[in-house]
Amino acid sequence: ENYIRQWKMLEKGDKVVVGLSGGADSVCLFLILEELRKKIGFEILAVHVNHGIRGEEAKADEEFVKTLCEKKEIPCRSVSVDIPKMAVEYRMSEEEAGRTARREIFEQAAEEWGGTRIALAHHQDDNAETFFLHLARGSGLRGLGGIYPVNGMYIRPLLCVGRKEIEDYLKGREMSYCIDA
């Protein structure tokens, strides 16, 4: 909560689109925002993206997300995309195609819903990984920066915590999550 306030990520009246895959990181983010929404006074729309890669597992993730949102009385949208096809079409890796598709889907949801923020579940470990990827690619000093906590309408409230803290948080709340096999 202090990190969110420090970076002025959320304010009363915001409409926050939350990327919710069902994995530990996004479930943690969703629960934290759900706890803060009444305290601060903002709305949440969860958006789940099925990448068309993992078949039945992906359908199970989608059901998990829908059930979680119903329990918390948070509206949820689920969008399916054929990422392998998109990757071939645009000559990019599936990872890059997935990132591009998610960004477009989140931004479209925000536009249609009147969203003011898009919350993503990147954490400290992701930030370190990004830094070293940039370093390995030979980025100059300017390109060495990691992930920004606030970038336009995008916010990343978990950048101040690591993966272990996220898992501990979920364990402490006896909250399950999906594991990407």
Go through the PLM ranges and name each one.
Residues 1-20, 24-181:
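Core alpha/beta nucleotide-donor-binding catalytic domains of modification enzymes
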